[in-house]
């Protein structure tokens, strides 16, 4: 954990906030109050659930691919830093 850079921490925290927000919306507890009459149909509920699932999946894939979280990724980052190709 000592060797995780600031960018990874910030992206991880923002991802966590986004995932909590989507989960709350999915279970009917929106952070921003929305009138109940705005969501009446099954299509709206399915759209919300599908949107949340897509957001979660896409966020996790992007986070995993854009951060050096595996041992191989950490070695790649070291090589890139030695060559001056990354921060």
Curated annotation (Swiss-Prot):
Disulfide bonds: none annotated. It is a single-pass membrane protein. One of its GO terms (cellular component) is membrane. The keyword RNA-binding does not apply. The chain crosses the membrane at residues 42-62. It is found in: Membrane. The keyword NAD does not apply. Keywords: Membrane, Transmembrane, Transmembrane helix. It holds the Pfam family Holin_SPP1. Belongs to the SPP1 holin family. This is Uncharacterized 9.5 kDa protein in ORF3 5'region.
């Amino acid at each position: 954990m000592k060797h995780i850079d600031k960018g990874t921490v910030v992206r991880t925290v923002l991802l966590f906030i986004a995932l909590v927000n989507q989960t709350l919306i999915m279970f009917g507890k929106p952070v921003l109050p929305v009138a109940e009459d705005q969501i009446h149909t099954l299509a709206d509920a399915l759209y919300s659930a599908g949107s949340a699932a897509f957001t979660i999946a896409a966020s996790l894939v992007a986070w995993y691919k854009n951060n050096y979280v595996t041992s191989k990724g950490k070695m790649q980052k070291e090589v890139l830093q030695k060559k001056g190709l990354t921060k």
